[in-house]
């Protein structure tokens, strides 16, 4: 079976505010439609991505800001952070883990807990290893995003 991730539904409290944020982030607006006041779907896709996000009225019963751990992959974490900050996105400083493990444990765009042995250190991974340098941010509702630098993918990816 060939399974592909297509859409992630984000819970937001204000559709127009979320739409403005994701436009500022630089995602492509694919669709903004609704047959009634009770239902409206706004669909964005990150440039070059096969997976999109969708939010709006009547889309989900989940609490606004409850989605965490959405990863956006970049080839140059410092350049991506700089560009997003220039667009007005509040992005954390770049960091890496002392043990070189994949980063996880975030809420609202920032760390709230870590896996055993994780130690968050400032800056890019010293050897520039793929999958090892991160920055975080959140949308206006607190849905948490992670920028992850990947310059060389794992085999089969």
Regions found by a protein language model. Name each.
Residues 1-19, 67-70, 146-157:
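N-terminal beta-strand motif that seeds the catalytic metal site of vicinal oxygen chelate
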Residues 3-5, 37-39, 48, 63-67, ...:
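Short, solvent-exposed coil/turn segments
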Residues 14, 76, 139:
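Acidic di-acidic motifs
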